[in-house]
Amino acid sequence: IFEVEPCGSTLRDGDVGELAIFSYIDGELDFTDKKVPMDLVKEMGTIGASHGWVATLKNGAVRLQDDLDPRASDTDPKRISLPPLVTLPHCQTQIVTNVAMSSSSPEDEECIVAVKFMGPQLSLCRPAQRDCKWTNIRITDPSFFFSHVMYSKRDEMFSMPASGGNYTGSWDLGRHRHKPKLQMLWYPEQRMVKDRLFDSCSRMEYYLVESSETGETFMVKWFTERNPRRKGRVKWEYFHVLRLDKEGNAV
């Protein structure tokens, strides 16, 4: 979690600010000497982040940059422009759900960048390859149209949960490019009964997360209830985290 305090401007980046990182150890903001473009912290400044890299979208092209990585140089930041996006018929490439990468740097030869757009389109590319171009996948199952994508090192595939969290879909650049690998998820009856209590929530979102330490996959359920009498302010939030084994059992 970061914060940026305005501190001036530069010819290269315009308005800039000092990067501060929230420390979970002491509960305080730790200010760094790193200066970053203020454009990156605007509401529509970025479309996603992965492994410390942030992605921006401008004029139909995605750019990856390491400005918000406190370990990266602010005098010589890395900024990698990807090929212009190609919009599939009856799809859109202006509203992005999120961005994921298969490795820690887009400069790695085998790194694959995935951009999940709201709707049916999922686009993949290898930035380090000389003839880098987008591979566009049309998702046919509407249950994935609003899902967030993540990369599984264990399975070497990009995966996302279906709406409702009942199953997952996984894609790659090989045989699962057009036909995703689907896996049903099985929840304990007691947990299903408890989750039904949140069926009336104003917001329910599902995310897949993989542990970099153990390779285990987790399903994160995020329930939000808003108070209409207080201009829609959040009344309460509830997070539920479940570990998924290789057979799809949630524990």
PLM feature segments, named:
Residues I1-V62, D67-A72:
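A non-catalytic, helix-rich entry segment at domain boundaries
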Residues S23-D26, L88, Q129, R243:
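Short acidic, glycine-rich loop/turn motifs
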Residues V41-G232:
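A sequence/structural signal of beta-propeller blade repeats
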Residues R229-V251:
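Structured C-terminal portions of repeat-based eukaryotic scaffold domains
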